[in-house]
Amino acid sequence: MNRSMNQVLARHFTAVNASLGRSKCRVLRAWGPNQLDSEWPKARNHPDLDLTLVAHGATFNGNRIDDGTRLLLKHLDPGEGTALDLGCGNGVIAAVLARRGLETTAIDVSWSAVAATRATAQANGLDIDVRWADGLSGFPDHSFDVITTNPPFHQGHAKESEPTLRMFDEAARVLRPGGQLWCVFNSHLPWRRELAARVGRTRVVAQDRNYQLTFTHL
């Protein structure tokens, strides 16, 4: 820890004290938090969707729409019933589902995403049940008619497939008979094969240079 940390803490607290150094370590004590104006959350209007997206600082892709999600939204035809947006981010997919009249639940493992999706729902006057959840263990079998997801394939900088594969298994459990799973992912990933093996009949709906959108039907 270098001395610049003193300056960082001093911007946010009224008093900062540093102990004597020992073995290249120091203890920093800071107290009296300053009241600072926050630039977050930030909102952005998307006229093509007639939606306002809201994001906090750690929300995936901020208040923008990534290319994979755009591909999904272009082709999404969810029908009616109950829907789950798995890994909701800034809430754009959940907002589209809710606007189309589906009873929509949105979950994410990131508290920033949960707060962003709630703010997006409020900004657009939509009723979305937004929850923090790490997976689908809290949902009973056959809970949803439709699941949408743009799943991650890395944890930090390390590629990690196990969480996504576990998510596919859980999706198969919570979907109702005849249910749909819409999944968009990087084209080089083998998720189509895994979806067919773990969930049900899977076909490619659309594909571009970077992303593949699949539709799985139970």
What do these predicted ranges mean?
Residues 67-149, 155:
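Conserved SAM/SAH cofactor-binding pocket of Class I
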